[in-house]
Amino acid sequence: MSSASSQRGSGRLARLRTRDFDRIHRQPARRERSRRFQVLARPNGLERARWGISVKAKLGNAVVRNRVKRRLREMLRAAALPAGWDFVVQPRDARVATADFAELALELRALLGKTLAEEGG
């Protein structure tokens, strides 16, 4: 692994495997929604966060769906996801592909924080 990739923190984040992805969909420990996203979360007992992105076909054609996934991947890389949790992010609106990136990132970070804030209450 190059030093550049380790500096970005890629060692802390990992994508979910299919069986873990399915487990979160069947039994999410936490679920929060905003206007443009839904986040499912579940403790994983590991020392790193894992994430997945689920984009439904109704959001648009392959070009739109792939653009949404690229943008979400970058937002998740920039977000400080806490270790010990699995996250699945689902966009709820095709406008995620064209909306202002900074605004979307702020909304997603707030939603992730809200998802984990349930722990205290």
Give residue spans per PLM region.
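Positively charged, solvent-exposed patches that mediate nucleic-acid binding
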Residues: 1-121
